[in-house]
């Protein structure tokens, strides 16, 4: 939905204001495999292990989402 930055279901979430569904001041993210303590995880950190010989998925440092590498189906 427009204007919603985070899931405001839990008032205990330190990253998200439950009343406005907006990130709290200073927060970059509220959840996601590449979000830790309201901040994006640094670029290159493994967020999803690959199977077989494919490379692991790694955080970009610019998003809370863990991008799928091009080798994953």
UniProtKB/Swiss-Prot annotation:
KW Disulfide bond (keyword) present: yes
Residue ranges of coiled coil: none
GO CC field: extracellular region; plasma membrane
Cysteine pairings via disulfide bonds: 6-21, 8-16, 15-38, 29-35, 34-59, 47-66
Domain Disintegrin positions: 1-73
Cited InterPro entries: Disintegrin_CS, Disintegrin_dom, Disintegrin_dom_sf
GO function term, MF aspect, one: toxin activity
Domain of life: Eukaryota
Keywords carried by this UniProt record: Cell adhesion impairing toxin, Disulfide bond, Hemostasis impairing toxin, Platelet aggregation inhibiting toxin, Secreted, Toxin
Location(s), subcellular: Secreted
Pfam families from the UniProt entry: Disintegrin (PF00200)
Chain location of the short sequence motif Cell attachment site per the record: 51-53
Expression by tissue: Expressed by the venom gland.
Gene3D superfamilies noted in UniProt: Disintegrin domain
Claim: Nucleus is one of the keywords in the record: no
Biological role: Inhibits fibrinogen interaction with platelets. Acts by binding to alpha-IIb/beta-3 (ITGA2B/ITGB3) on the platelet surface and inhibits aggregation induced by ADP, thrombin, platelet-activating factor and collagen.
Family: Belongs to the venom metalloproteinase (M12B) family. P-II subfamily. P-IIa sub-subfamily.
Note: The disintegrin belongs to the medium disintegrin subfamily.
Subunit composition and interactions: Monomer (disintegrin).
Name of the protein in its database record: Disintegrin molossin
């Amino acid at each position: 939905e427009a204007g919603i930055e985070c899931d405001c279901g839990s008032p205990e979430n330190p990253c998200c204001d439950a009343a406005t569904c907006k990130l709290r001041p200073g927060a970059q993210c509220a959840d996601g495999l590449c979000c830790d303590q309201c901040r994006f995880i640094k670029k290159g950190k493994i967020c999803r292990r690959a199977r077989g010989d494919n490379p692991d998925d790694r955080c970009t440092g610019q998003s809370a989402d863990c991008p799928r590498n091009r080798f994953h189906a």
